[in-house]
UniProtKB/Swiss-Prot annotation:
Family, per entry: Belongs to the SmpB family.
GO-annotated biological processes: trans-translation
Record's keyword annotation contains RNA-binding: yes
Pfam families xrefs: SmpB (PF01668)
PROSITE patterns assigned: SSRP
Domain of life, source organism: Bacteria
SUPFAM superfamilies noted in UniProt: Small protein B (SmpB) (SSF74982)
UniProt name for this protein: SsrA-binding protein
Organism from which the protein derives: Actinobacillus pleuropneumoniae serotype 5b (strain L20)
Role played: Required for rescue of stalled ribosomes mediated by trans-translation. Binds to transfer-messenger RNA (tmRNA), required for stable association of tmRNA with ribosomes. tmRNA and SmpB together mimic tRNA shape, replacing the anticodon stem-loop with SmpB. tmRNA is encoded by the ssrA gene; the 2 termini fold to resemble tRNA(Ala) and it encodes a 'tag peptide', a short internal open reading frame. During trans-translation Ala-aminoacylated tmRNA acts like a tRNA, entering the A-site of stalled ribosomes, displacing the stalled mRNA.
Gene Ontology molecular function: any one: RNA binding
InterPro entries registered for this protein in UniProt: SmpB, SsrA-bd_prot, SsrA-bd_prot_CS
Cellular component, GO, one term: cytosol
PANTHER family reported for this sequence: SSRA-BINDING PROTEIN, TMRNA-BINDING COMPONENT OF TRANS-TRANSLATION TAGGING COMPLEX
Amino acid sequence: MAKKPKVASNTIALNKRARHEYFIEEEIEAGLELQGWEVKSLRAGKANIGDSYVTFRNGEAFLFGATITPLNMASTHIVCDPTRTRKLLLNKRELDSLFGKVNRDGMTVVALSLYWKNAWAKVKVGVAKGKKLHDKREDIKDREWQVAKQRIMKNANRG
């Protein structure tokens, strides 16, 4: 019997820090306007969206702070800028919705994950509100309690 081929994960990069530092109120999927070398680098998994956020200019949305490291084999006649701003591909209704929510007090749009959908690179952006220090501490307490609860249940089941 032949082995089943491993299914590769569609996720390229995650922004775990965003969920720690923000309350995510809404998530939207957006396309990215990429150059050829960027697509090759994404296929190799060389992306970081840890410090990325979305800004609006002239009625369009742009992703700032995302780093896509060029491959060593990248073309020499093209200038590869790893931190260039990349245009988000959203329809007018989604842009207006995001822009209206960002104009509210304390709201921002952050990149949550970068992934493949069929052959297209997509970014999941979230409309977020910043957490205070005590909110972060509550999250840590809840997480630790869940781990302790699992440990107690595991030991109780052993009998």
